[in-house]
Amino acid sequence: MKKMMIATLAAASVLLAVANQAHAGATLDAVQKKGFVQCGISDGLPGFSYADADGKFSGIDVDVCRGVAAAVFGDDTKVKYTPLTAKERFTALQSGEVDLLSRNTTWTSSRDAGMGMAFTGVTYYDGIGFLTHDKAGLKSAKELDGATVCIQAGTDTELNVADYFKANNMKYTPVTFDRSDESAKALESGRCDTLASDQSQLYALRIKLSNPAEWIVLPEVISKEPLGPVVRRGDDEWFSIVRWTLFAMLNAEEMGINSQNVDEKAANPATPDMAHLLGKEGDYGKDLKLDNKWAYNIIKQVGNYSEIFERNVGSESPLKIKRGQNNLWNNGGIQYAPPVR
C-alpha cells in the first residue's frame, strides 16, 4: 500500500511538472505564433504612453513594450497597444487580452502576491504628490486641510491620500474619476482644490493644462510608488524576458553603450560582461529562448535606460523631470541591474 502511494505521488509529481513546463512557455509561444506583443498601456499620459496626432505612441512604458518586441523578434515595431484605464488594466492582463502590462503601475504586495500577477522590475521610482494652482498660495501639502481632492479611481492614490490626511489630522473630500485627463479637467475647472497622483503623472498632466506655468507641484512626496511592467504569474519564461529587457537597458547605460555606439562596442567589447550583453561571447540568449543578439537589438532599436528616460520625461522632453532616484546606483540613484553572466 505504501509503495503504491509513493508511486502514485511520483506519477502525479511528473504530470504536474509537465503541466507547469507546458504552461511556463505559453505566453512566448502565443506571442511568436501571432507575430507581435500585445501591450497594455495607459490611456493618455505624456512621457509614459501617449499618442500623437498621427496615432503613434511614445513614452517610457511604450519603450518597454518596444524593447520586449526587439528582444523576441529582433524588431521593435512588432507590438500592438491596448490603452487601458486604471480600473481595466488588471482584468485585461488576467484574462489574456494583453501579454504584458506596461502602464505606470505601482508594485505592491497585494498586487504581486494576491492577484495572480508578477512585477518584473521598476522602470520608474515615483511617489504621490499634489498639484495645485499657484493662486492658492500653498507651500505645503500640510496646508490642504478641508480641501477637495481629485483622484483617479482604481489607483493606490485613493488609499495613500486617505492615510496621509489621517496621519496629519486633516480632513478632505475626494472626487474620483476613471481617467486621468478627467481629473485634470476637473482641477482646471475649479471642481477640486488639488489633484493627487504620482508626481511623474502630475508633471505630465500639468503640460496639458491651458496655462501650465500657473500650476505647481507641492514639495511633499507622501508615498513610495515603484512603477514597473507586470505579467501573469506562473509563466517564468515570459517573466524573465520582460525582466531582462529592462536589465539590458540599465546595463547598457552603466557600460556606456547606447543606440549610437552599440555597433562600435559590439565590434570591440571592452569587458567580458559587455561581450556577454551584446551577444559576442557565450550563449546567454538560450537561457531566455532568444537569439544571442536579444540585448543588442533592444539597445540598437530602443536605446539604453538614459536615452529612454531623457527623451520621454527628462531633459529632452517637455516634462524636464530630473533623474533623482532613477539615476544609476553609481551616480546617486537606486537603479541597478544584475549582469549577463
Curated annotation (Swiss-Prot):
Pfam families from the xrefs?
SBP_bac_3
Supply one GO CC term from the record.
Answer: outer membrane-bounded periplasmic space
Q: Per its UniProt record, what PROSITE patterns does this chain match?
A: SBP_BACTERIAL_3
Judging by the UniProt lineage, the source's domain of life is Bacteria
Where in the cell does this protein reside? Periplasm
**Record's keyword annotation contains Transport:** yes
> Would the keyword Transferase be found if you checked this record's keyword annotation?
no
Which UniProt keyword terms apply here? Amino-acid transport, Periplasm, Signal, Transport
CDD domains in the record: PBP2_BztA
GO biological process terms, alphabetically, are: amino acid transport
Signal peptide limits? 1-19
| Family, similarity comment | Belongs to the bacterial solute-binding protein 3 family.
Entry's PANTHER family?
A: AMINO ACID ABC TRANSPORTER PERMEASE, AMINO-ACID ABC TRANSPORTER-BINDING PROTEIN YHDW-RELATED
Could you tell me what this protein does? Probably part of the binding-protein-dependent transport system YdhWXYZ for an amino acid.
- The name on file for this protein is Putative amino-acid ABC transporter-binding protein YhdW
